Structure formats: structure tokens, C-alpha cells
Amino acid sequence: MTDTIAPEATPEGAEAGQAGIRILAQFVRDFSFENPLAPDALRAGAAQPAIDMGVEMNARGRADGLFEVDLKLSARAEREGQAVFHVEVVYGGLFHIAGIAEEDLEPVLLIECPRFLFPYARRLISDVTAEGGFPPFLIDPIDFAGVYAARKAQAEGQQVGNA
């Protein structure tokens, strides 16, 4: 009996030519946490900070036919004009995408792939803010389809304005 799987074997339920997304690797590309006012910012009774969130999705094809997708999440908390904390994570994934029409590839890369990466990036931010002495910062689920549509509309509006 052997535990090796033949290279030509396909994952359960996947047949040749069937559309699918496989995550081959996921990784932290960049990670930063700043806590400039510690320990003073951690005092009890301090006013709730204002938090500014940012999200970016980027994808690029590789020569080997795979795709790298990066999800960048950033959060900056300020109280009385001073940074309380600033966290930024770029979480990446290496994807194999098969059976997807060329016109559908961009939405898959910038909506579905970030959706797979989001829980891991969210956990990193939650963990590091807790380790920084703050309550865990839990990012609400992100509507990646809405973000994609808004950015696409904005880009098309800029192209029309520049024509």
C-alpha cells in the first residue's frame, strides 16, 4: 500500500476541463504593526479611536500559467489627531485557475481569490492588535464583488473623462 498520488490524478470531484480554482500556496508578503503611543494609548477610559480601513486587491499572471493574488488590508486608528495604531498586511496566494473564460478571469482573480485569502489576513490583524494591548480588531466581511464593481466603474469613468 502506498500514500503517493499519481501526478495525473485529479482532486475528488474534479474532471479534466472542469472549471476550478486551486490554492497552491498562501503567504504573508508584507506585515507591519505600529503602536507609537504604547503604553499610554492603552489606558482605561480613553476615548474610542476613529478607524480608517483600506482594502486593495491585485493580481498578476506568471510565465508558468499560475496567478499571484495579493490582498492588502490596512487599518489606522487615531485619537485626538494622533495615531494609536497602524496595521497593514499584504497576504498573497498562488492560484491555479482552469476552465475559466478569458472575460471571466479578472473577476475571479479580484473577487473570488481575495475571498479565499480574507479570513487569514483578518486573523493576522485581529491577533496583532490583541498582542499590541488593544481589543482584537475584527474586520467585518468585505463585499469583494462590490469593491470590484465600484473600482471598475471609477476606472471607466476616468477613462471617459480623459477621452
UniProtKB/Swiss-Prot annotation:
GO biological process, one term: protein tetramerization
GO molecular function annotations of the record: unfolded protein binding
UniProt entry keywords in alphabetical sequence: Chaperone, Cytoplasm, Protein transport, Translocation, Transport
InterPro entries named in the record: SecB, SecB-like_sf
CC terms in the record's Gene Ontology section: cytoplasm
SUPFAM superfamilies given in the database record: SecB-like (SSF54611)
Subcellular location field: Cytoplasm
NCBIfam families per the UniProt record, alphabetical: PRK05751.1-3, secB
Quaternary structure, from the entry: Homotetramer, a dimer of dimers. One homotetramer interacts with 1 SecA dimer.
Protein task: One of the proteins required for the normal export of preproteins out of the cell cytoplasm. It is a molecular chaperone that binds to a subset of precursor proteins, maintaining them in a translocation-competent state. It also specifically binds to its receptor SecA.
Protein name: Protein-export protein SecB
Protein's organism: Caulobacter vibrioides (strain NA1000 / CB15N)
